[in-house]
Amino acid sequence: MLDLKFIRDNLDLVKRSIKARGLVLDIDKLIYLDDKRKKIITKIGELNAKRNENSSKMRENLDKVLKISLIETGKILKKQLIDLEEELERVSFDFDLENKRVPNILSPDVPIGNSEEDNFEIKKVGIIPRFDFKPKDHLELGRDLDLLDFDRAREVSGSKFYYLKNEAVFLEIALINFSLNKLREKGFNVFITPDVAREFIVDGIGFNPRGNESNIYKIEDTDKYLVGTSEITLGGYYYNKIIDLTLPIKMAGFSHCFRKEAGAYGQLSKGLYRVHQFSKVEMFCFCKAEESSIIHDEFLSIQEQIFTELEIPYRVLNICSFDLGSPAYKKYDIEAWMPGRDGKGGYGEITSTSNCTDYQSRRLKIRYKDQDGQNKFAHMVNGTAIATTRVIISILENFQDEKGGVKIPKSLVKYTGFDYIPFKN
């Protein structure tokens, strides 16, 4: 959510952000509703003053006729106030709805575009493997190495669920421990977060839980949702608090993630790439306004360190305006090389990191005191450390060998306890 004074003072900038994101939003309607809301509040104040004056007169020693007149006036004022308060409630509801739809402004260096083709490639890192044999995709490897079972999961839970088996279980746990240890070494406080959040927290982070395109599951007959990312629960940790930001507060959260992924059934979404449930380690930071861009770049650097140590080839993208979620001021993606992607190999997203400035903290009322003792809204930065399913794809497909097995990246061996997954007949 943006500051309304900022919107009024920077109307053209806000409109350009809306247009660049491909959104349809009438910002002038928001201004109209705000003006109307203020006028109603003023009228209510005036009527309350008249009502108080009328009540004061009634306490005086009056003749019967004048007292009856004041009683009737009091009834009229009461009815007018009720009508105005009901109108204020309706207008405020519409105002809040429109206000929440306004996206964050864009960083000046965000590429303007209308598809993922307009994302700007910053760099490529690592050597794409060349095989002397026909490489398998992760589904074939998962079958031949007895690591994955989608068929039984489909019977038990439905499509886009899966069982991890045997070495894949230890590989997932190794990835979690590897990333959490790295983040702890870098000064992050480590959490296992709830997998459930209340609606006002989900909404405050910038997800639209009631929208037609909502990607998260609601728990029936409650105000709670299964989280699609621990960004939600980490971001809500300091809801309605004034926090000490002498130093940035860096948090690392492990959680399960649940997503509907409606309609995601194409070739590029097969197997583990797009599923209803997966495990993830998330980075999160609360910081001062002047620190968020630095923290954002730091998060990207940590992500690069992780995938460099995992020896996975990747590329870094500066995400274009059309692909940004409403809270994001700027976003980087890292895409890993996946030899089995689309039958010929390609890059697929494995992490992202977003600087959301004070967009989320305004909704969640998370503040800090600046050097002058004034309350300011904290800036909030998030980023994926490890989303296990997609990293497992990358490891299986990049580290397969001619024997049909898969080597384990050296940085993970101390966590897995083995350095090779053999072919199983």
Curated annotation (Swiss-Prot):
> What disulfide bonds does the UniProt entry report for this chain?
none
Query: In which residues is ATP bound?
Result: R259, K260, E261, V275, E349, I350, T351, S352
Q: Which UniProt keywords apply?
A: Aminoacyl-tRNA synthetase, ATP-binding, Cytoplasm, Ligase, Nucleotide-binding, Protein biosynthesis
GO biological process entries: selenocysteine biosynthetic process; seryl-tRNA aminoacylation
- Pathway terms, separated by semicolons: Aminoacyl-tRNA biosynthesis; selenocysteinyl-tRNA(Sec) biosynthesis; L-seryl-tRNA(Sec) from L-serine and tRNA(Sec): step 1/1
Where it sits in the cell: the answer is: Cytoplasm
Is-annotated flag, keyword ATP-binding? yes
Q: Per its UniProt record, what InterPro entries does this chain match?
A: aa-tRNA-synt_IIb, aa-tRNA-synth_II, aa-tRNA-synth_II/BPL/LPL, Ser-tRNA-ligase_type_1, Ser-tRNA-synth_1_N, SerRS_1_N_sf, SerRS_core, tRNA-bd_arm
**Which family, according to the similarity comment?**
Belongs to the class-II aminoacyl-tRNA synthetase family. Type-1 seryl-tRNA synthetase subfamily.
Self-association or partners: how does it assemble?
Homodimer. The tRNA molecule binds across the dimer.
The name on file for this protein is: Serine--tRNA ligase
